[in-house]
Amino acid sequence: MTRIKINARRIFSLLIPFFFFTSVHAEQTAAPAKPVTVEAKNETFAPQHHDQYLSWKATSEQSERVDALAEDPRLVILWAGYPFSRDYNKPRGHAFAVTDVRETLRTGAPKNAEDGPLPMACWSCKSPDVARLIQKDGEDGYFHGKWARGGPEIVNNLGCADCHNTASPEFAKGKPELTLSRPYAARAMEAIGKPFEKAGRFDQQSMVCGQCHVEYYFDGKNKAVKFPWDDGMKVENMEQYYDKIAFSDWTNSLSKTPMLKAQHPEYETWTAGIHGKNNVTCIDCHMPKVQNAEGKLYTDHKIGNPFDNFAQTCANCHTQDKAALQKVVAERKQSINDLKIKVEDQLVHAHFEAKAALDAGATEAEMKPIQDDIRHAQWRWDLAIASHGIHMHAPEEGLRMLGTAMDKAADARTKLARLLATKGITHEIQIPDISTKEKAQQAIGLNMEQIKAEKQDFIKTVIPQWEEQARKNGLLSQ
């Protein structure tokens, strides 16, 4: 027995230097960093994909800014305490992706790379530079830190390398070679049984759009992007998932409710609608095949309204004329908008009534079931309206979600009336004048003059520094 112990000790003593040497040697000869093959400068690919590039560049014509808060000031109250109450414009062309996220009041006016209200994740759907940085630094390296850290790096507008494997021989030959450039999107597709590599061509066409046109949240300390699809893709499934992990995007400053903010869930709503169920893809409607001057077919990258290309989009499947289909879509849009406004009115009252209950001394336990109803009502409303095309993608699902939102909001207000009565408040809670965006912002205590002044200073001083640094580093062509 003693001999065995001695031999074991001798063997161990001989192995220690070996392990030490091997460990040190491994550190010294670590595999080189993976080469960065993502080229973010979109103009690089103009020679091979000339027509596609020019049509993509034409998204700069989609330049109109539409102020959604001015159109509907109720939104300011629903998002009280959240950056969306400051500024929310309807989407413009892809050519404005970087400009719009830089200039929105939501991203604040950071003075340095560690300053500002938002995380790096807020760049994730804006630029092929995101794919480049993820390849270069890994996901943890990319997501780490504040949004301002990415300013000098994320400078090219949403484009080629977001959807295509631009480093592949196939792409160099003029073929599409689609890819999921965001690893978190690939994981989400796998979670719902749709691994990209095994998907058919039609599925892949919509999946690349679904990297960004989708609901997501910021997870963990690094605020990494994750899709909440673990329990399914319907509004109730995602609501259940968020409740299970006790996630909230922010706390409404009036009702003190932990809230959820839907993003832009076009992939989910398209999947639930008649087009998705019949494998009519995003590309079929928004990026149809068109002819160039020589008669050659190519995919139009000026992503837009299908009615603008009726003969190449809707008319491929529908026998009705353009006017007839536009009438149907307009009626659906009006129905959804009418119910949307009714839900918003209920939620506005619920937030102010909840504030009155809290001011009257309502306890956390008394407020919990009410706040749950407000949270769920607004989540369902938001998922329906955040997808700007739901009247086309899934009108029935949109109306269903808004209907359940109305029920939840009514439940909250019924409970609030009972609770307020126990506090001696039986009169109607007065709502301040929120008839304009400015009045609504004043009602929730926003100092918009200061916020706008700080942003203008940021635009004039910080953004030029970012662009100068990007040019020095070869990240911008001009």
From Swiss-Prot:
<keyword id="KW-0479">Metal-binding</keyword>
<feature type="binding site" description="covalent">
    <location>
        <position position="209"/>
    </location>
    <ligand>
        <name>heme c 3</name>
    </ligand>
</feature>
<keyword id="KW-0408">Iron</keyword>
<keyword id="KW-0249">Electron transport</keyword>
<feature type="binding site" description="axial binding residue">
    <location>
        <position position="164"/>
    </location>
    <ligand>
        <name>heme c 2</name>
    </ligand>
</feature>
<feature type="binding site" description="axial binding residue">
    <location>
        <position position="126"/>
    </location>
    <ligand>
        <name>heme</name>
    </ligand>
</feature>
<protein>
    <recommendedName>
        <fullName>Cytochrome c-552</fullName>
        <ecNumber>1.7.2.2</ecNumber>
    </recommendedName>
</protein>
<keyword id="KW-0560">Oxidoreductase</keyword>
<dbReference type="GO" id="GO:0042128">
    <property type="term" value="P:nitrate assimilation"/>
</dbReference>
<feature type="binding site" description="axial binding residue">
    <location>
        <position position="94"/>
    </location>
    <ligand>
        <name>heme c 3</name>
    </ligand>
</feature>
<feature type="binding site" description="axial binding residue">
    <location>
        <position position="318"/>
    </location>
    <ligand>
        <name>heme c 5</name>
    </ligand>
</feature>
<feature type="binding site" description="covalent">
    <location>
        <position position="212"/>
    </location>
    <ligand>
        <name>heme c 3</name>
    </ligand>
</feature>
<keyword id="KW-0349">Heme</keyword>
<feature type="binding site">
    <location>
        <position position="216"/>
    </location>
    <ligand>
        <name>Ca(2+)</name>
    </ligand>
</feature>
<feature type="binding site">
    <location>
        <position position="264"/>
    </location>
    <ligand>
        <name>substrate</name>
    </ligand>
</feature>
<feature type="binding site">
    <location>
        <position position="261"/>
    </location>
    <ligand>
        <name>Ca(2+)</name>
    </ligand>
</feature>
<keyword id="KW-0106">Calcium</keyword>
<dbReference type="GO" id="GO:0042279">
    <property type="term" value="F:nitrite reductase (cytochrome, ammonia-forming) activity"/>
</dbReference>
<dbReference type="GO" id="GO:0005509">
    <property type="term" value="F:calcium ion binding"/>
</dbReference>
<dbReference type="InterPro" id="IPR017570">
    <property type="entry name" value="Cyt_c_NO2Rdtase_formate-dep"/>
</dbReference>
<feature type="signal peptide">
    <location>
        <begin position="1"/>
        <end position="26"/>
    </location>
</feature>
<dbReference type="GO" id="GO:0005506">
    <property type="term" value="F:iron ion binding"/>
</dbReference>
<comment type="pathway">
    <text>Nitrogen metabolism; nitrate reduction (assimilation).</text>
</comment>
<keyword id="KW-0574">Periplasm</keyword>
<comment type="function">
    <text>Catalyzes the reduction of nitrite to ammonia, consuming six electrons in the process.</text>
</comment>
<keyword id="KW-0732">Signal</keyword>
<feature type="binding site" description="axial binding residue">
    <location>
        <position position="301"/>
    </location>
    <ligand>
        <name>heme c 2</name>
    </ligand>
</feature>
<dbReference type="GO" id="GO:0030288">
    <property type="term" value="C:outer membrane-bounded periplasmic space"/>
</dbReference>
<feature type="binding site" description="axial binding residue">
    <location>
        <position position="286"/>
    </location>
    <ligand>
        <name>heme c 4</name>
    </ligand>
</feature>
<feature type="binding site">
    <location>
        <position position="215"/>
    </location>
    <ligand>
        <name>Ca(2+)</name>
    </ligand>
</feature>
<dbReference type="InterPro" id="IPR003321">
    <property type="entry name" value="Cyt_c552"/>
</dbReference>
<dbReference type="GO" id="GO:0019645">
    <property type="term" value="P:anaerobic electron transport chain"/>
</dbReference>
<dbReference type="GO" id="GO:0020037">
    <property type="term" value="F:heme binding"/>
</dbReference>
<feature type="binding site" description="covalent">
    <location>
        <position position="317"/>
    </location>
    <ligand>
        <name>heme c 5</name>
    </ligand>
</feature>
<feature type="binding site" description="covalent">
    <location>
        <position position="314"/>
    </location>
    <ligand>
        <name>heme c 5</name>
    </ligand>
</feature>
<feature type="binding site" description="covalent">
    <location>
        <position position="282"/>
    </location>
    <ligand>
        <name>heme c 4</name>
    </ligand>
</feature>
<feature type="binding site" description="covalent">
    <location>
        <position position="285"/>
    </location>
    <ligand>
        <name>heme c 4</name>
    </ligand>
</feature>
<feature type="binding site">
    <location>
        <position position="216"/>
    </location>
    <ligand>
        <name>substrate</name>
    </ligand>
</feature>
<dbReference type="Pfam" id="PF02335">
    <property type="entry name" value="Cytochrom_C552"/>
</dbReference>
<feature type="binding site" description="covalent">
    <location>
        <position position="125"/>
    </location>
    <ligand>
        <name>heme</name>
    </ligand>
</feature>
<feature type="binding site" description="covalent">
    <location>
        <position position="122"/>
    </location>
    <ligand>
        <name>heme</name>
    </ligand>
</feature>
<comment type="similarity">
    <text>Belongs to the cytochrome c-552 family.</text>
</comment>
